[in-house]
A protein has these predicted regions:
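C-terminal functional extensions of proteins
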Residues: 204-254, 259-290, 295-364
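Loop/turn positions that initiate beta-strands
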Residues: 83-91
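Active-site histidine-anchored catalytic micro-motif
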Residues: 150, 172, 177-223, 292
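Glycine-rich phosphate/diphosphate-binding loops that line cofactor/substrate pockets in enzymes
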Residues: 135-150, 171, 247, 282-287
Length: 364
């Protein structure tokens, strides 16, 4: 099996319905963070806007945001970030009536029916066969390693298993990880595993509780705060394994978003939810593949800020692949209806998932 990137089919704007469509209307923002009445809200699909007779694509889109027309460019801006004077696109139709066109079928494959491998609106559960999904994902990762940007969104479950930590470390070291987004817990327990060989006080191989082990993650946080940064903590304590260690060693960017339940937190964790969301969106702006693992909150947040397409530097429009993996069917199904070429789901234990992928890619 060899991965081939689907071709994007742009709308034919020579058709009368596009030629006859009006230019988009805009209205200014009067109050910071408040969109004007009848603002247009974006989806994950490619959306075109008619400006001065030309249909323009909003290149860096996301769900549930406004479109600002600025110097002939279309900027997709979260409503909370709107500023007075911003010219916001108006209209709530999507077939050209308001100069707005939503293009949901840009990646169709001619000669293929809707049982295509990338049509995801179908039930998937623990009983689904995922052999083909793993094969497709591994081919995709081989392609993205060279041609794209793979961002991993991870919950703390990885840190509780020695094999999963080793597999993810190998993925980083072999170039399959270009960005990591997580919370305080993943980083804390991964560093705990490196320093004490425990996670929440349990040995990460035998799962046996260690004496006073419930102090271990708190000690890690305390020591890291004493060091002043995670990289300095790694150096000060001669950390030589784990997910966070490998990301730091290989200069893989990390975004750690805090929450109200965090201990500590570690230095570098972003405590302001909206600053964290902004940092996450900055990381996924040029991502071409996003893999979300065992974290419902971060998965939904990432899915909402990630469109189903990416515009490359040369103007090529390609699909953006999103995978969500969790042992809970409810979690993965939260993103199942985001659309074709948008979310692929696998219901499984994430420790087993990463080990299968790493072995399939022959990095362990």
């Amino acid at each position: 099996m060899s991965f081939k990137l689907p071709v994007y089919h742009a709308p034919d704007f020579s058709q009368p319905k596009f030629q006859d469509a009006p230019n988009v209307q805009t209205a200014p923002v009067l109050q910071a963070g408040v969109a004007p009445e009848n603002y247009h809200s974006t989806s994950m699909f490619p959306e075109y806007f008619k400006v001065n007779g030309q249909w323009l694509l909003a290149k860096e889109s996301r769900m549930d945001s406004s479109v600002v027309l600025q110097d002939g460019q279309l900027l997709v801006v979260e409503n909370r970030n709107l500023q007075p004077g911003d010219q916001v696109v108006l209209g709530r139709t999507e077939q050209g009536e308001d100069g707005i066109y939503l293009h949901a079928n840009g990646f169709y494959e001619e000669g293929r029916d809707h049982d295509d491998q990338f049509v995801f609106r179908q039930g998937r559960s623990r009983e689904t066969s995922y052999a083909r999904d793993y094969d497709e994902l591994m081919e995709l990762l081989r392609y993205e390693k060279v041609h794209g940007k793979v961002v991993w969104v991870m919950g703390p479950a990885f840190a509780f298993d020695s094999d999963a930590r080793a597999a993810m470390q190998a993925m980083v070291e072999n170039g399959y990880v270009h960005g990591l987004m997580a919370g305080n817990a993943l980083a804390t327990h991964d560093l705990e595993g490196a320093l004490f060989h425990t996670a929440l006080g349990q040995d990460i191989y035998t799962q046996r509780p260690q004496p006073n082990g419930h102090y271990n993650h708190l000690d890690v946080i305390n020591l890291a705060r004493q060091s002043g940064s995670i990289p300095q903590f790694i150096q000060d304590h001669n950390i030589q394994d784990g997910i966070i260690y490998s990301c730091v060693a290989h200069h893989v960017p990390i975004v750690l978003a805090g929450s109200i339940r965090d201990d500590g937190p570690l230095p570098g964790v972003i405590g302001d939810a909206y600053q964290a969301a902004g940092a996450m969106r900055d990381m996924v702006r040029d991502a071409t593949c996003v893999i979300c693992l065992a974290t419902m909150l971060h998965t939904i947040a990432t899915g909402n800020m990630t469109p189903c397409f990416r515009v490359l530097a040369d103007g090529t429009i390609r699909p953006l692949y999103i995978y969500t993996v969790d042992a809970d069917e409810f979690v993965v199904n939260k993103l199942l209806d985001r659309g074709s070429l948008s979310a692929k789901t696998i219901v499984t234990n994430v420790q087993d998932f990463i080990t299968i992928v790493a072995r399939g890619l022959k990095v362990i």
